[in-house]
From Swiss-Prot:
Keywords: Developmental protein, Differentiation, Disulfide bond, Glycoprotein, Immunoglobulin domain, Neurogenesis, Secreted, Signal
Gene giving rise to this polypeptide: SEMA3D
Domain notes per entry: Strong binding to neuropilin is mediated by the carboxy third of the protein.
Subcellular locations according to the entry: Secreted
Family indicated by similarity: Belongs to the semaphorin family.
Protein name: Semaphorin-3D
Record SUPFAM superfamilies: Immunoglobulin (SSF48726), Plexin repeat (SSF103575), Sema domain (SSF101912)
Native species: Gallus gallus
Region span, Disordered: 728-761
Ranges in a coiled coil: none
InterPro entries reported for this sequence: Ig-like_dom (IPR007110), Ig-like_dom_sf (IPR036179), Ig-like_fold (IPR013783), IL-1RAcP-like_ig (IPR041416), PSI (IPR016201), Sema3D_Sema (IPR042582), Semap_dom (IPR001627), Semap_dom_sf (IPR036352)
Glycosylation site list: N127, N595
Ranges where the Sema domain occurs: 32-519
């Protein structure tokens, strides 16, 4: 077993520096494409829900792909939306908290806006026509049923307010508390706090068929079971082909003293219970008798067991496979360290999780002792096993378990071994950035060169990262961040995400908004085959005319795509021609001697490295430009200060990604001698020359400051402004010559067009 000790602050810092590059030093960790909220709207790949207002807190989503609809739980509202367009045929139910409950909530010291309202936290499909719904009810949770039509076209959408019931142990009191629930066979499984203060947490089962109500919960008297648990997700997952073995798996984090120190730490867990658990006969009555839990580890292995841990579980996503018993488990974790802030994504297999639950139990003599492996005799049937006729015909229910099985599981709910990632460590990390990961969804995508899991990650600042982990030679992993998308106008904590593979859309909720986002924006990568291949997006391929959505086809090499290496030379027939003939955009730039000029070059990819080359006038060879005090390289181009005559020539801006180098733009710089400008100015009359020189000096100084401070302000725009200014000055200069004629025209117009005046009296 690997050591699970928590490194001290110094070792954490050194490990962070060892494993994780400082921001800005690794081009590969930078998102290749960064799109703003405005960019997404212009690309028609983002649809914000227009029915939202600030503070509605869109935290709960229920996706119904079969009928093409999305149920959204928010503050005092439940929305029924169209999956194709969130703003089409919107229906809503207004369900506020009772006024007396709101007053009691405020008297208890809670905030009137963020606490004392009815925040919808449960939306679970009960049957074909009804959805079970629960809201916090201003710290007095309530539950009920929403009636829906069975078909998409039906307009039924109403809450049965006559049959509301208490939501205690089904829904949290606090709207901000992490919470998980799932409906299975008409039973509601929920992990939540059972009291107003949120100290007592429990995993419960309620509801059920009318003839078979069996309320079950965790044992509050056993502190080994749960300690300050924060539930993240829960899922029904079959273990075998025998339905009697079906289990509910739940993922959470809790306070623990698993380490060798006396300090309390937060650890992530995976737990499970049997679906057919009925509680005990003489002990653990109406309590789980099959409750087990194990540690879920997401860490970077370090020297001598000093691993760098990401201990706080934030979200879980199950990626379905062909075998429903073995989905892949994707988890988002964050650090608890005060030394550095980081997030990671780890992947687990159900086979590894089951192996831990079938392994040794942990034992603790008392609260002052450490957890050790239990070496004693394990009672029969094995604690945690579901009762099944095929396993033992004499044990038909958990109420038939022997007393020693019940006693054992009360004291030994924790497994000794931990569950480790399938790949040995995280498949994705974010370190030394100003945000943390909060949500995850994953899509399994078929590409030309293989199959890839595309990961979509929500952050606490309202951005979505689109990434892919690529397996290279010798099973090494390459982490590629394809896009960083600002999906909200203002930074906002992303609290929920759902994916529709049928619609190829993400649905993302936060405190201040709800957004529908396309999984791909192939056209934004560029208009050339090379741009499409360099993107390495499994969704996109070059079809001969444009970068568009890839669809598997039987035609050999019908689409150009290279996710694994991103090599356009091997995929695009026109690349060699474009390299040899340099088919990049070409512009002519004019600069004035001794002034500054800016050569603009903005690569589409943030992962590209830029190099500048110059071919001076009258010379055959090119040389690479080196930055110095006069030549300054910026993210948006090249600033040349105190322009010299020898600076004239052709400037080539070249971008390199991986081994592929191509010219983005060619700029032909012409330097106008300062003497030419002076001789032109001497032809003007003395008065105008002095006035214009004073004005021009001030304006050029302003323009120079603007040019230096804003690299995005191109020299072309500067020259255009100068040209318009000169034209206006010339018009004003010649205006006096025609002043007399213009005055005569005005008099004539007044004489011909003045209305007749009434006679004076």
């Amino acid at each position: 077993m690997r050591a699970s000790q928590v490194p001290n602050a110094c070792s954490l810092l050194s490990l962070a520096m060892l494993f994780f590059p400082v921001t800005g030093t690794s081009k590969q960790n930078i998102p290749r494409l960064k799109l703003s909220y405005k960019d997404l709207l212009l690309s028609n790949s983002c649809i914000p829900f227009l029915g939202s207002t600030e503070g509605l807190d869109f935290r709960t989503l229920l996706l119904d792909e079969e009928r093409g609809r999305l149920l959204v739980g928010a503050k005092d509202h439940i929305f029924l939306l169209n999956l194709v367009d969130l703003n089409k045929n919107v229906k809503k139910i207004y369900w506020p908290a009772a006024k007396e409950k709101m007053e009691l909530c405020k008297l208890a010291g809670k905030d009137a806006h963020t606490d004392c309202a009815n925040f919808i936290r449960v939306l679970q499909p009960y049957n074909r026509t009804h959805v079970y719904v629960c809201g916090t009810g201003a710290f007095h949770p309530l539950c009920g049923y929403i009636e829906l039509g069975t078909h998409k076209e039906e307009t039924i959408f109403r809450l049965d307010t006559q049959n509301l019931e208490s939501g205690r142990l089904k829904c949290p009191f606090d709207p901000q508390q992490p919470f998980a629930s799932v409906m299975a066979d008409e039973y509601l499984y929920a992990g939540t706090a059972s009291d107003f203060l949120g100290k007592d947490t429990a995993l419960t089962r309620s509801l059920g068929p009318s003839h078979d109500h069996h309320y079950i919960r965790t044992d509050i008297s056993e502190h080994y079971w749960l300690t300050g648990a924060k539930f993240i997700a829960t899922f029904p997952i079959p273990d075998t082909y025998n339905p009697d073995d079906d289990k509910i798996y739940f993922f959470f984090r809790e306070i623990s003293q698993d380490s060798s120190t006396s300090d309390k730490t937060i650890l992530s867990r995976v737990g499970r219970v049997c679906k057919n658990d009925m509680g005990g006969q003489r002990s653990l009555i109406n309590k789980w008798t099959t409750f087990l839990k194990a540690r879920l580890v997401c860490s970077i292995p370090g020297p001598e067991g000093a691993d760098t841990h990401f201990d706080e579980l934030q979200d879980i996503f199950l990626l379905s496979t062909r075998d429903e018993r073995n989905p892949l488990v994707y988890g988002v974790f964050t650090t608890t360290s005060s030394v550095f802030k980081g997030s990671a994504v780890c992947v687990y297999s159900m086979a590894d999780i089951r192996a831990v639950f079938n392994g040794p139990y942990a034992h603790k003599e008392s609260a002052d002792h450490r957890w050790v492996q239990y070496e004693g005799r394990i009672p029969y049937p094995r604690p945690g096993t579901c009762p099944s006729k095929t396993y033992d015909p004499l044990i038909k229910s958990t109420r038939d378990f022997p007393d020693e099985v019940i006693s054992f599981i009360k004291r030994h709910p924790l497994m000794y071994k931990s569950v480790y990632p399938l790949t040995g460590g995280p498949v994705f990390t974010r370190i030394n950035v100003d945000y943390r990961l909060t949500q995850i969804v994953v899509d399994h995508v078929m590409a030309e060169d293989g199959q890839y899991d595309v990961i979509f990650l929500g952050t606490d600042i309202g951005t979505v990262l689109k990434a892919v982990s690529i397996t290279k030679e010798k099973w090494t992993k390459e982490e590629v961040v394809l896009e960083e998308l600002q999906i909200f106008k203002h930074p906002s904590f992303i609290s929920t995400m759902e994916i529709s593979q049928k619609q190829q859309q993400l649905y993302i909720g936060s405190r201040d908004g709800l957004v529908q986002l396309s999984l791909h924006r192939c056209h934004t990568y560029g208009k050339a085959c090379a741009d499409c291949c360099l993107a390495r997006d499994p969704y996109c391929a070059w079809d001969g005319n444009s970068c568009s959505r890839y669809a598997p086809t039987s035609k050999r090499r019908a689409r150009r795509q290279d996710v694994k290496y991103g090599d356009p030379v091997a995929q695009c027939w026109d690349v060699e021609d474009s390299i040899s003939h340099e088919t990049a955009d070409e512009k002519v730039i004019f600069g004035i001697e001794f002034n500054s000029t800016f050569l603009e070059c903005i690569p589409k990819s943030q992962q590209a490295s830029i190099r500048w080359y110059i071919q001076r006038s009258g010379e055959e060879h090119r040389e690479e430009l080196k930055a110095d005090e006069r030549i300054i390289k910026t993210e948006h181009g090249l600033l040349i200060r105190s322009l010299q005559r020898r600076d004239a020539g052709a400037y080539f801006c070249k971008a390199q990604e991986h081994t592929f180098i191509h010219t983005i733009v060619k700029l032909n710089l012409n330097v106008i001698e300062n003497g030419q400008m002076e001789s032109t100015q001497k032809t003007e009359d003395e008065e105008g020359r002095v006035r214009d020189l004073l004005t021009e000096s001030r304006l050029r100084y302003k323009d120079y400051i603007q040019l230096v401070s804003s690299p995005s302000f191109s020299l072309d725009e500067y020259c255009e402004q100068m040209w318009h200014r000169e034209k206006r000055r010339q018009r004003n200069k010649g205006g006096a010559k025609w002043k007399h004629v213009q005055e005569m025209k005005k008099k004539r117009n007044r004489r011909h067009h003045e209305p007749a005046r009434p006679p004076s009296t």
